[in-house]
């Protein structure tokens, strides 16, 4: 997962999976346009080197549709055929269903919207970087921990850590500063787990 738009160290991950014959499934949901800066010999975008790459195009993403949408990419023909079938109710041919699948076909309206918005992704990511740089320069309080992001981070979220959360929230509210919680709970704290 390239959390908050910051590239994970794919070089290190690929070394581990190569030794263990594991496929790499790349969660690119928050990293549209991020460069893999763990490998300095090439400047490939996140999602272009894994066995399977998944992109969420939920409206709140850096590249978002107007409704739920997503993309899966692969250069493996076997994976491609299975994914194509699963996203079309398990169908391999018209009226032939070999698998249990779901209706996950991207509709034409969402495709048109995304195609138009894609043209602005680079420009919008640059704007996010400029804003993040302003935060980095101006958040000087040593009680606020700023995360360390990759060089090509596209800042899906700008995240900070604070010890006295409730006190900090009151300060933000009093100062009329907008804030939010991206992940209010760790996944292992949820009832399902």
Task: Please report, for each region that a protein language model flagged, where it lies by residue.
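Active-site phosphate/pyrophosphate- and oxyanion-stabilizing loops and adjacent acidic/basic residues
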Residues: 11, 44, 68
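Proline-centered loop/turn at the N-terminus of a beta-strand
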Residues: 21-23, 52, 178
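A cross-family glycoside hydrolase active-site/sugar-binding cleft signature
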Residues: 27, 56, 182
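Active-site PLP attachment segment
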Residues: 48-82
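Hydrophobic residues in beta-strands of the RecA-like P-loop NTPase core, especially within AAA+ ATPase
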Residues: 1, 25-26
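Radical SAM/AdoMet-radical enzyme domain recognition
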Residues: 35-52
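PLP-dependent aminotransferase class I/II
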Residues: 1, 6-15, 19, 31, ...
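Short gly/pro/ser/thr-enriched loop/turn and capping motifs at secondary-structure boundaries
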Residues: 30-32, 63-64
């Amino acid at each position: 997962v390239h959390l908050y738009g910051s590239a994970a160290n794919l070089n290190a991950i690929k070394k581990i999976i190569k030794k263990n014959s594991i496929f790499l499934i790349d969660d690119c949901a928050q990293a549209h346009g991020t460069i893999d800066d763990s490998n300095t010999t090439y400047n490939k975008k996140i999602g272009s080197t894994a066995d399977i790459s998944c992109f969420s195009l939920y409206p709140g993403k850096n590249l978002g549709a107007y409704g739920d949408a997503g993309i899966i990419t692969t250069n493996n023909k076997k994976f491609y055929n299975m994914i194509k079938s699963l996203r079309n109710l398990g169908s391999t041919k018209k009226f032939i269903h070999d698998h249990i699948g779901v209706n996950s076909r991207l509709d034409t309206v969402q495709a048109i919207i995304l195609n138009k918005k894609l043209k602005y992704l680079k420009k919008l990511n640059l704007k996010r970087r400029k804003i993040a740089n302003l935060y980095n320069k101006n958040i000087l309080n040593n009680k606020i921990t700023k995360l360390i992001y990759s060089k090509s981070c596209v800042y899906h979220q700008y995240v900070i850590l604070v010890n006295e959360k409730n006190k900090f929230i009151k300060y933000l509210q009093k100062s009329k500063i907008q804030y939010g919680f991206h992940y209010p709970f760790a996944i292992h704290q949820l009832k399902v787990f």
